A protein has these predicted regions:
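Structured helix-beta-strand junction loops
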Residues: 56-57, 83
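Ser/Thr-centric signal marking residues that sit
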Residues: 35, 63-66
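Short coil/turn linker and secondary-structure boundary residues
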Residues: 45, 67-68
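Intrinsically disordered, low-complexity polar/acidic regions
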Residues: 62-63, 94
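Extended hydrophobic
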Residues: 69-116
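Amphipathic alpha-helical effector-binding/dimerization core
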Residues: 1-56
Length: 116
């Protein structure tokens, strides 16, 4: 879920490769702008709110692939909106790619996300 400027992991299921000792554990907070789920949730904001969000946050590079240019980030988030799912490749951790698909309510609201 989107929590202020971050993504908050609520639950984890199955086996996964651990990048560090806290990645993916319930309660983990990660930056929204460089995670697949974060881009998915940000894509649900209207254009004005999204633009304000991106331009008001300090975009820190975690890897050489982290997008820190606001215009490029806005472009990627809008592509996420068009696609309907989020993708990142080595933006938060080197050599880690993620796809995030939405969990949608009956009235078409994004309630959460599943990450792979």
């Amino acid at each position: 879920m989107l929590y202020e400027e971050s993504i908050l992991h609520l639950a984890t299921a199955g086996q996964f490769i651990v990048c560090n000792d806290k990645y993916g554990l319930p309660g983990t907070v990660l930056p929204a702008y460089c995670t697949a789920a974060g881009k998915l949730f940000l894509s649900q904001l209207d254009d004005e709110t999204l633009e304000t969000w991106v331009r008001s946050h300090n975009l820190v590079p975690y890897t050489a692939n982290t997008i820190i240019d606001p215009d490029e980030l806005l472009k990627q988030i809008r592509q996420t909106r068009e696609r309907g799912y989020g993708i990142v490749i080595s933006e938060l951790y080197d050599f880690v790619a993620c796809i995030s698909i939405p969990v949608i309510s009956q009235d078409n609201r994004v309630l959460g996300a599943l990450n792979f």
